[in-house]
Amino acid sequence: MKIFLAGATGAIGRRLTPLLVAAGHHVTGMTRNPASADALEKAGISTALVDVFDADALKTAMVDAAPEVVMHQLTDLPHVLENENQLAAAYPRNARIRLHGTRNLIAAAQAAAARRFIVQSVAFGYAPGREPHSEDDPLDVKDGPRAVTIGAAADMERQVLTSGMPGIVLRYGFFYGPGTWHEGPTRRPAVHIDVAAHAAVLAVTRGHTGTYNIVEEDGTVSIAKARSELGFDPTFRVFP
């Protein structure tokens, strides 16, 4: 299957790309960095050198790639977390990707006649209430410290689920593992980066339009739906 992967050089993208290739998919990895494009080509995948905010160029690249599936794993967060001030500066940038970058990706996917759109969201945005949270529970989009992040995620999900394409939202927990900020879980709900990539591979051919919690079981968030409909395994690891 032909897949257009936005965010191919990010924390998930670096673990996800070889899994997609191993599964027999043809991957076009999107990046705005020429050096990253060279690295993707050396990894054996096609590349699209384009900025998500350049709507016309993105549409051209997407149509040229002619993907059956578009996967949105883009974020704008620091690669190395040195202090909390970095996050305060990054949140608005990340929200812009979720709001405006998503809109451009959806428009490009529609122009390319893609048949499925997969996007990463967050499983740590539920409003306080009974646990474990299911996908039907409301998100905490009220004013407060998390309003920018969760509000943008909620809008992104709405865009995907109302696009007219089959859309799958993967709500990830806090990442840990290779290429992330932490070697082990530090906050709940957590998810190993390999597990997040594993879920994305499953979503290429499984599941139905809607949301799926992708976390490790700790009693805060339910993964029953992902287990049942995706065949999700929260213990999955890439070796090495």
Stretches with model-predicted labels:
Residues T28, A48, I168:
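Conserved beta-strand positions in the Rossmann-like core of class I SAM-dependent methyltransferases
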Residues F175-G179, R187-Y212, E216-E217, S228:
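Alpha-helical substrate-binding/gating segment
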Residues S46, V50, A55, T205, ...:
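C-terminal amphipathic/interface module of NAD(P)-dependent oxidoreductases
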Residues R116, Q120-F124, K142, D155-P178:
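Conserved beta-loop-beta element that borders a ligand/cofactor-binding pocket
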Residues R32-E41, I45-H100:
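NAD(P)H-binding glycine-rich loop region in Rossmannoid oxidoreductase-like domains
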Residues L81-G144:
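Conserved Rossmann-fold NAD(P)-dependent oxidoreductase catalytic core, especially the SDR/UDP-sugar
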Residues I3-H26:
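N-terminal Rossmann NAD(P)H-binding glycine-rich loop of SDR-like oxidoreductase domains
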Residues G101-L105, A109, M156, V160, ...:
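Hydrophobic positions on the long internal alpha-helix
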